[in-house]
Amino acid sequence: MKSTLLNMTAVLFGITLIASAGVGAVNMITAEPIAQAEQAAKTAALNGVLPAFDETAAETLTIDEMPITVYTATKGGQLAGYAVESMTKNGFGGAINMMVGFTPDGEVINVNVLKQAETPGLGTKMADADNVLLRSVKGQKLEEKKLVNGKLAVAKDGGDVDALTAATISSRAYVEAINRAWMAYKSVATGATPTDVSSGATSAAGDTAEEQTSGPEAQEGGQNE
């Protein structure tokens, strides 16, 4: 009986050891391709919001308790622009991540939405090329926009950023992430002290109640301008 128990223990130990070795080997094999894919995705995102560059230096700031990374891009030793990897947790479907490009003097070059889980056909349009949100900021210096308490805001909240049709919550979240990127850009480019960006993405009480009584496809549809 004792011998059988020892044999079973030895077998189980051997199986566990082999399984652990197998998992470790798989991790070693897949780690490099995953890292390469992540780097390729980041390079593509930077290329999408910056002019030609050959080097970047990254600096991560904390704004609203979130990590916001600023990439200072140079070409031939000359400043080419800044790319800011920004985010918000206040999208209708959760977190939204984006890359925002700025010229050295603060003009928005482009915005590339990297991750979002908004309502298909409504909030997801923020990732479309030439959508109304992007048109409201691209090629412009944000300090020259109609600001509310020093920040960008959608028209419904007193600003001049056009919101996506029937997707006010998503639009507010997009603008919040842009504001956070702008704050980070100013901190790195001009030395301004970064301050938290008060959320404009949380819906008003009436908006929330309207969403809760709507069907899945109509949830953001209840937020018509």
Tell me the role of every PLM-derived stretch.
Residues 2-225:
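Flexible, solvent-exposed loop/hinge segments and secondary-structure transition points
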